[in-house]
């Protein structure tokens, strides 16, 4: 019968790290990207087939002109001189329901007309009169009607 030795319990073999504990999330330990500090999306963008170019091209063959004039945006001066207007889909989002909601909000924030206000009828004045000196037995002299 074999006996259990203390040396087996404290062996120098470390347990394997789990995949979710890798420093670069989602990479296998031996992957190409494991030593880089590039995100997975950036790595895919940089190494996508659209960006691959054969290394056998000469100095000026097959490369795009990086200047602003011949770039993908076209003439930037003409683009700059155009007036700034919101895209047409912005105005489609503002429906009649939005206008009605705005109108209701404005009506609810308008003050009452002066004829509707009578002394003692505002909620603040009713509260102050209820807690005034006569209601509290004359003890509170700091509250006064507005």
Swiss-Prot record:
Stretches the record annotates as Disordered: 1-33, 50-70
Organism superkingdom: Eukaryota
Identification of the protein by name: Putative uncharacterized protein encoded by LINC00588
């Amino acid at each position: 019968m074999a006996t259990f030795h203390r040396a087996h319990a404290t062996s120098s073999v470390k347990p394997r790290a789990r995949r979710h504990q890798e420093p670069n999330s989602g990479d296998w330990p031996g992957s190409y990207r494991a030593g880089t500090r590039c995100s997975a999306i950036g790595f895919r963008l940089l190494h996508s087939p659209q960006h691959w170019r054969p290394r056998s091209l000469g100095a000026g063959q097959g490369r795009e002109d990086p200047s602003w004039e011949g770039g993908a945006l076209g003439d930037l001066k003409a683009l700059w001189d155009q007036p700034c207007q919101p895209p047409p889909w912005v105005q489609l989002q503002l429906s009649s329901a939005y206008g009605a909601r705005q109108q209701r909000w404005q009506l609810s924030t308008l003050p009452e007309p002066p004829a509707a206000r009578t002394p003692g009828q505002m909620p603040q004045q009713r509260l102050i009169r209820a807690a005034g000196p006569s209601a509290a037995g004359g003890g509170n002299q700091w509250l006064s009607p507005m």
